[in-house]
């Protein structure tokens, strides 16, 4: 597994690199924190571990840049005790979030879970669903409508799959939150709202933002 570890604390970087390599992970770091994307594109990581507080530009900036060109899983690290960091990471399409200090074995377990979810599942037979006049590719986390294609984060795709497998039915927020927790994603009532709003924003790019309806006090419904 190729891991890009974007961490400016060299002591922590070396400790994590040593631990991860004991699990046969191939770990690369950053030499110039103004050129993170250069390393990202040349190393082609399978998972990115991204610190929030970085020199020159913060982790949120680099997450945006990565999401412009890739749907690679991103796990944020943060030493700040600020719930908005977690919300922001969700809005930007991160797959997980850990607050420092943390147990290394928990980090490794999260990385393994992300890898299984993203790469082992997508290696299976292609799974698609038809929704309105679009094709939802569950293996690629994408939606194609005509000549246009959008890409979703893992959390967004889980939400969408739940809704479109129960088309024209109200799915409660609690049902979705439970499914996300079972999938080891990080989620709360507020971050669910953030994810649904971000999902709608992406759907608007293919003129499908009204395809998911909010049922106030009840949940959400995907229309046929």
Swiss-Prot record:
CDD domains, per database record: REC_OmpR_NsrR-like (cd18159), trans_reg_C (cd00383)
Gene3D superfamilies in the cross-refs: 3.40.50.2300, Winged helix-like DNA-binding domain superfamily/Winged helix DNA-binding domain
One of the GO biological process terms: regulation of DNA-templated transcription
PROSITE patterns: OMPR_PHOB, RESPONSE_REGULATORY
Mitochondrion is among the record's keywords: no
Modified residues (4-aspartylphosphate): 51
SMART domains: REC (SM00448), Trans_reg_C (SM00862)
Alphabetical keyword list: Activator, Antibiotic resistance, Cytoplasm, DNA-binding, Phosphoprotein, Repressor, Transcription, Transcription regulation, Two-component regulatory system, Virulence
Positions of disulphide bridges: none
InterPro entries, per database record: CheY-like_superfamily, OmpR/PhoB-type_DNA-bd, Sig_transdc_resp-reg_C-effctor, Sig_transdc_resp-reg_receiver, WalR-like, WH-like_DNA-bd_sf
Ranges of the DNA-binding region feature: 126-224
Modified residues annotated as Phosphothreonine in this record: 128, 130, 149
Presence of the UniProt keyword tRNA processing in the record: no
GO cellular component, as recorded: cytosol; protein-DNA complex
PTM comment: Phosphorylated by GraS. Phosphorylated by Stk1; phosphorylation increases the DNA-binding activity of GraR.
Example of a GO MF term: transcription cis-regulatory region binding
Summary of the function given for this chain in its UniProt record: Member of the two-component regulatory system GraR/GraS involved in resistance against cationic antimicrobial peptides (CAMPs). Upon phosphorylation by GraS, functions as a transcription regulator by direct binding to promoter regions of target genes such as adhesins, exoproteins, transporters, toxins, and proteins involved in cell wall synthesis. Down-regulates the expression of many genes involved in RNA and amino acid synthesis or glycolysis.
Subunit structure: Interacts with GraX.
Name of the protein in question: Response regulator protein GraR
Encoding gene, per UniProt annotation: graR
């Amino acid at each position: 597994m190729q891991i890009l570890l974007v961490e400016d604390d060299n002591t922590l970087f070396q400790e994590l690199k040593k631990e991860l390599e004991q699990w046969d992970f191939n770990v690369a770091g950053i030499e110039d924190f103004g050129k993170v994307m250069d390393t990202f594109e040349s190393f082609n990581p399978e998972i990115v571990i991204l610190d929030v507080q970085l020199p020159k530009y913060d982790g949120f900036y680099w997450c945006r840049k990565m999401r412009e060109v890739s749907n690679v899983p991103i796990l944020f690290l943060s030493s700040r005790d600020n719930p908005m960091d977690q919300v922001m990471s969700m809005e930007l399409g991160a797959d997980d979030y850990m607050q420092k200090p943390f147990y290394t074995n928990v980090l490794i377990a999260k990385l393994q879970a992300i890898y299984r979810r993203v790469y082992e599942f997508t290696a299976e037979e292609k799974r698609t669903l038809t929704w309105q006049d679009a094709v939802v590719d569950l293996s690629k986390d994408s939606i194609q409508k005509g000549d246009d294609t959008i890409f979703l984060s893992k959390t967004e795709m889980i939400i969408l799959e739940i809704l479109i497998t129960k088309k024209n039915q109200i799915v409660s927020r609690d049902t979705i939150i439970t499914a996300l927790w079972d999938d080891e994603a990080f989620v709360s009532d507020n971050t669910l709202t953030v994810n649904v709003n971000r999902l709608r924003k992406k759907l608007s790019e293919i003129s499908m933002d009204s395809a998911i309806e909010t049922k106030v006090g009840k949940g959400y419904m995907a229309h046929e």
